[in-house]
Amino acid sequence: MAKKMKLSEITNMFAGMNVEALEGVTIEGDIEIDLGGLGGFDPMLAAALGQESAVLAQHFARIAGMFGYPVSVGAPAAAPAAVSPALAAPKLKDLIPAKFEFSNIEEWTTQVEEVPIGNTSADGGSRGKRILLGGEKALPFFPDAPMPNRNQVTIDVFDMRLGLAKAVKENYDDVMDNPGEWAKKNVEKFNADMITIHLISTDPLIKDTSPKDAAKTVEEVLQAVDVPIAIGGSGNPQKDPLVLAKAAEVAEGERCLLASASLNLDYAAIAEAALKYDHDVLSWTQLDMNAQKELNRKLMKQCNVPRDRIIMDPTTAALGYGLDYAYTNMERIRLAALMGDDELTFPMSSGTTNAWGARESWMVSSPLKEDSDWGPREYRGPIWEIITGLSLAIAGNDLFMMMHPTSVAVLKHMTQTLFGSIEAEPVDIANWIGAEV
């Protein structure tokens, strides 16, 4: 049996002999590492320890060489023999033929209600066109169930001059004192599908404009444009029902969208005006699906509003200010509707203009000195509104209330391309490095 020696014993053997180096001497043997006390361990650990042991062997060989005692280590294993070309797998000339089919989602059993806005002369009104919202049988842009009606954009108009972001104001500064001209510019120059007239001057804390005078502004807008319109109040829960009722009266037969009925005001009065004067109702809640169900149920059961006259606004939180909540809420509402919740099977509207409430959309730069450059707000603001709108379009939103003309144009182009009414131009992706965006 071969004698076992420790590396330290080899060193001690030559101690005191004044040997500087050995020539022509070869030390042969195996290196053993004592792992006693570890107990059993799995094969993976054994393999790992084997690899580490090989590394240690290399280190021991170098240490021995430093003392003048060369130690040979095992030669590396020979490379595996090359596979004969004759035995190699043949290359495929063609991929295996396969057909991709969209699966039918059995849970989606219910169609979203289709709601018209605007009455033409054939319907007893004076609008030049009627738009349809809703009617979906699946999530938006789903190839297996194409959307019957495209997304629509309504551009905001206000009944008084107010402070707006510079990027927005420069487009409307010449018409902000004339709601009729403002509406006309939105339609003729900025291609608005609808107009939303916000009667903010009726707020008791602003101008406290009377419902009668506010109704005259609605008449002015109706005469200036022939697209469908939405009529909004000031947000004052005491004044809005009175203002919207009077506005509904002067717009009788035009099938406007009254914005809005909510749980914190007299929704019954707004619903009554809608039924009496032939209008639709915007059912507005604040990021709460259960509250949305409750309000819709009350409009239908207590106020007898027909299903084809209800549009929901679950509230839009802008990019950076809760967009994920708004998106999730809308998506949950739409999925619940498709799966049969008849209290939620209505088209949805988004106050996409809320994007301009985010300071990042309109401020010149960050208030923090150490922050990075935000870029020009002339581009940043519209992009903020576009991203907010597009995100909610994917979640299932149908109608977008917007402000900036560029945002409107881009969002309409993107959603109509996804809808299929605009053919996208081919892009040479091979030249992606030098491509212009």
Curated annotation (Swiss-Prot):
Transmembrane segment boundaries: none
HAMAP family reported for this sequence: CdhD
Family matches, as NCBIfam families: cdhD, PRK04452.1-1, PRK04452.1-2
Subunit structure: Heterodimer of delta and gamma chains. The ACDS complex is made up of alpha, epsilon, beta, gamma and delta chains with a probable stoichiometry of (alpha(2)epsilon(2))(4)-beta(8)-(gamma(1)delta(1))(8) (Potential).
Keywords tagged on the record: Methanogenesis
Record-level GO BP terms: methanogenesis, from acetate; one-carbon metabolic process
Family membership: Belongs to the CdhD family.
Top-level taxon of the source organism: Archaea
PANTHER family in alphabetical order: ACETYL-COA DECARBONYLASE_SYNTHASE COMPLEX SUBUNIT DELTA, PTHR36214
Pathway annotation from the record: One-carbon metabolism; methanogenesis from acetate
Protein name: Acetyl-CoA decarbonylase/synthase complex subunit delta 2
InterPro entries the UniProt entry points to: Ac-CoA_synth_d_su_TIM-brl, ACDS_complex_subunit, CO_DH/Ac-CoA_synth_dsu, Dihydropteroate_synth-like_sf
GO molecular function, one term: anaerobic carbon-monoxide dehydrogenase activity
Species of origin: Methanosarcina thermophila
Protein task: Part of a complex that catalyzes the reversible cleavage of acetyl-CoA, allowing growth on acetate as sole source of carbon and energy. Probably maintains the overall quaternary structure of the ACDS complex.
